[in-house]
Amino acid sequence: MRGEVKMKIGAITVGQSPRTDVTADIMGIFNGKAEILERGGLDGLTREQIQEFTPKEGDYVLVSRLNDGTSVTFAERHIIPRLQQAIQELEEQGTAFIMMFCTGKFPDTLKAKVPLIYPCEILDRVVPLLTAASSILVVTPSPLQITQSEEKWSRIVAQVSVTACSPYGEWKELEEAASLVKDTKADLVVLDCIGFSQEMKQLFAKETGKPVILPRTLLARLVSELTDV
């Protein structure tokens, strides 16, 4: 009996690969029918080298995870060429399509020969469908991202409240953040970073009593439609 051939799916993190924290929550969704091949925008770089990417005023800010489990904050513009290289490498490995392990917005200059699936594009379309009052609470990793998050979501929904709490910090900080926002008026909570886990989703759902959108599983469930054959 022939072994089942798994579909090759690329995954690009803006930080360092592999993102074992993300795949821990999503591999079960693919039900053994997919092989995930990963690359990262900061792969091969030391923390000292990454510090040269520190955001300046006007930069689009990203937060991601390094191999040692710590997080870094950096300007997107520094890694665009590295992301393009990652796309090319994954295409050469025969991936059917590529998932971006980041909810940030990326420039149209990134090109791929296979479908390149951005969580932000999914969120932009799905979130308005799930809030009757067009009112959401967004959790973003860094205070440096609050303004860009407010600007982005205010174009999509009528009312948005944004708070900052890193998925890469201490669990106590997440508990405090969830407690602080539990009375915020909103229909829906959006954990706007691929770093937020299923356990973190459950924490915010319990504290706020509201439905919570988790990008990593939303992305995987959409992509699994293409592997479920």
Predicted features by range, described:
Residues 99-106, 111-147, 151-155, 159-176, ...:
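Conserved mixed alpha/beta catalytic, RNA-binding, or beta-rich assembly cores of soluble enzyme
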Residues 9-12, 98, 136, 189:
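Buried hydrophobic positions in well-ordered alpha/beta secondary-structure cores of metabolic enzymes
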Residues 2-73, 140-170:
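N-terminal glycine-rich anion-binding loop in soluble enzyme alpha/beta folds
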Residues 90, 180-183, 204:
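Generic structural signal for hydrophobic
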